[in-house]
Amino acid sequence: ISIATNSGSVNFGDSGDDIHRFTGSLDISGSRISFDDGKQNIAIGTNSIGASGFTGTTNIAIGENAMLDANGANTNYNIVIGYNAGKSFGANNVYSNILIGRQAGMNINSGDASNTIAIGTNAGIDITSGQRNLLIGTEAGTNISTADYNVAIGYHAMHGDDSTAGTGNSNIAVGYEALKGATTGYENVAIGNSAGTSATTAYRSVIIGASAGDAITTTPGVVLIGYNAGGAINHDDAAYTVAIGQNAGAAITSGRYQTLVGYNAGVSITEGDSNTFIGHNSGDALTTGLENTALGYSSLGANITGQRSVAIGNNALGTNLASGWTYNTAVGWGAGSNNTVGSSGTFIGSKAGYNATGSYNTFVGTSAGEGGTTSAP
């Protein structure tokens, strides 16, 4: 033991590679304690940076087996913290990764996986060569293997299928179990608790809102925004559905080419095709009708199976009780509303044809034909 009394220092050993073991407590005071191996690496924990002859520089490995197998050239600038985190670094050019959490990025073994950020228990655990992924949350992106450019934030976000390697690129999943089932699907955006949670191979969809699109598995190209929007879609026939608003299109299973905007817009549609409903409760009773257009609060609001009608204005064709009412055109507040039987009518003006019961009628003007029962021809 050498004591330098002029500075108050205590020196142990004769060279920098001497090993020192302490039994009991070790109390160190002062400004810092350095764990530097001469290459600007810091390794703390059993087997951290465990490979002999490691030549990488400027790495931080903290935890048992952190960077255990690291031995490739240019393995630099990594921050790895946690049991088995980054354990399999064995290739050249594995650099600039941030892995924090038990087994985070444990199987990365290719320089292609550089610039990965995985934070959370098992986050990115199956990544081998997938590059530039950002994964934050317990088991976020767990089954991603070779996929690139994904962002998963939240518990089980983009978790994937334990039996299928995740290879889909360029997905964004934010929220508890958002895109949880993703395997090969690509270029999806899912934001919200359980948004798109069952999607496996679906692609190029935008799903925003808690439980929005949560039954989708393979359906591509949907835009679903709002709580439970498109929540029952489960068939590829419903591809390219647009449903915006709480519960918009919530019952659609296989209905095609729908555009639904507003709270409860088209909420009851199951298999109807090519409907466009814009407005609070617009088309909210329709189930299997097709090629209808409704614009305004509660427009076309009570028709169940009607087809090829146009309703523009609040309550236009709004409380139509004829379930199969078809080929009607109504423009104006309440136009054609409360019609119990009738098809192929034209109602233009506020309350035009209101309470009318006939078919093939044309009523133009405020309250024109209100309460009428005439049919023509």
Question: For the regions a protein language model found, what residue spans apply to each?
Answer:
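A signal for long, low-complexity, Ser/Thr/Asn-enriched, surface-exposed stalk/shaft
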Residues: I1-S31
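Glycine- and small/polar-enriched repetitive beta-structure motifs of secreted/surface proteins
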Residues: T23-P377
